[in-house]
Amino acid sequence: VTPADPRSEDGPRARFERSIGFTLDPFQHRAMDAIDRGESVLVSAPTGSGKTLVADYAVARALDAGGKAFYTTPIKALSNQKFAELGARYGAHRVGLLTGDISHQPGAPIVVMTTEVLRNMLFARSTLLDDLQVVILDEVHYLQDPYRGSVWEEVLVLSPPGVVFVSLSATVNNAKDFGRWLTSVRGTTRVVVETHRPVTLHHHYAVAERGRDGVAVLPLLRNGAPNPDGLKLDERRKRSVHQRFRAPRRSEVVEYLHAAGMLPAITFIFSRAACDDATRQVVDDGLRLTTDAERARIRSLVESSVERLSDDDLRTLGYGPWSAALEAGVAPHHAGLVPAFRQAVERCFSEGLLK
């Protein structure tokens, strides 16, 4: 992936920069310089800062050199999203997808897959590895996961020597140490760290008062220190036998966000069943967050996603309540959903139809 003069007017770097239509940040330039030198690179940057643009450039370089690029992600939802993005950029015929559920165009020059799929290909010495030039490891900090981290390590150790790795991570404290380890395993690996967060994070408490409807929202921090109003609430809760305040219902939080113009929102719940229960609670409490036009579009996307499932299958899977929730603008998303349902949720979310 090191053709001559990548920065020349007709070179891959110049063509790529023209195609994106905006000026790159310095950290993106540094990472792309490393790729132009044929080096692997570790990019550590906050969410929303544009680190995936570095991966997109590495993919473009591999294609320009007549090779293949594999884009790995830790979860199927990210694979599906990246598959759609790369297909829109390079053409659907040039992008494949390999997950536990789907095998679509595995011989394409760009293949998006979960990291476990690549590990299994390496174990099997698959011919799909022929001409592989670039591997993107998205969310590479999963390497530190006690349960799945060995998968990322095996991919790094077992991949052919000439493959360039572009490893993407959220901000980590030990990026330089991580980079030194990558260099020991893969050869020269440039570490590029960006600390500026372009999308500011704001943290809040949400509380409700017993016997009353509605939600009060308090900033978690004030002038960089814990909000004293929040600390007072906490102290009252500890002292009081009959607590005045309670955790708000999910529907109350959604109503607050809706009134404040803060939708769409994602609620993270660490249980599949609890995700489904939360969806039912919001819908059963009467929230309808979509317009007539949005509901019609949701219905169309849902019907196209489930068209291969029989009526009996749909009844067994609880299609009626699930699709009604989607039309209301609310949906669960987790690995327990059948692929057709999960695809419908992702398509609706990507179009801004889910709230």
PLM regions with names:
Residues 67-123, 180, 190:
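Conserved nucleic-acid-binding Ia/Ib motif block in the N-terminal RecA-like helicase ATPase lobe
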Residues 1-41, 67, 292-327:
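Helicase-associated low-complexity/disordered flanking segments
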Residues 37-43, 67-68, 108-109, 163-164, ...:
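Pre-Walker A (Motif I) flank of P-loop NTPase domains
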Residues 44-47, 54-81, 160-162:
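Conserved SF1/SF2 helicase motif Ia
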Residues 157, 164-166, 171-281, 331, ...:
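Conserved interdomain linker/interface between the two RecA-like ATPase lobes of SF2 helicase motors
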Residues 111, 115-117, 123-167:
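SF2 helicase catalytic motif II
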Residues 33-40, 52-67, 87, 153, ...:
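Walker A/P-loop NTP-binding motif
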Residues 80, 87-96, 273-353:
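Conserved C-terminal RecA-like helicase domain
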